[in-house]
Amino acid sequence: MKKIIQNILPLLGLFVLIGCATPQPQVTRYAWVTGLKPDKAERYEDLHAHPWPAVNQMIKACHIQNFSIHEREINGQLYLFAYLEYAGTNFDADMKHMAADPETVRWWKETDPCQSPLPDAAAKGKIWSDTKEVYFLP
């Protein structure tokens, strides 16, 4: 009996540790699209080739990871596609926090004039149009 308990005890301890482990936040994927003004493309690319450290820090502080922006020309029009993963627990609150950051606001004043919102976003006073995920392979 003593030998059985000695063999089972470490397993029980492992199960307790696994059960008490802090759960990792669920990651939510987001993607958007917008137009890019051809005469502002070089400026936009230069800004993102040399992002401001405070802006990158704010993005990370707001639980954003694996953030990327891609550019594509389609029929003579430039488009931007943005993708990110959100690992926080309150996306709206984090976005409000980011929007209240003076350095981020200053950054957006540099990048927004480079972009050309699609009609649905423009109608809402937004820059980026939401997209719908149609496939994901974890």
Question: For each of these PLM feature ranges, what is it?
Answer:
Residues M58-Q65, E85-S129:
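An amphipathic, aromatic/His-enriched active-site/gating alpha helix that lines ligand/cofactor pockets
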Residues M1-L9:
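Bacterial N-terminal signal peptides that target proteins for export
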Residues K40-Q65:
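Short amphipathic alpha-helical segments
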Residues V16-G19:
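C-terminal motif of bacterial Sec signal peptides marking the signal peptidase cleavage site
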Residues T34-L36, Y83-Y86:
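Short beta-strand-to-loop capping motifs
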Residues A21-Q26:
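Bacterial Sec signal peptide processing site at the extreme N-terminus
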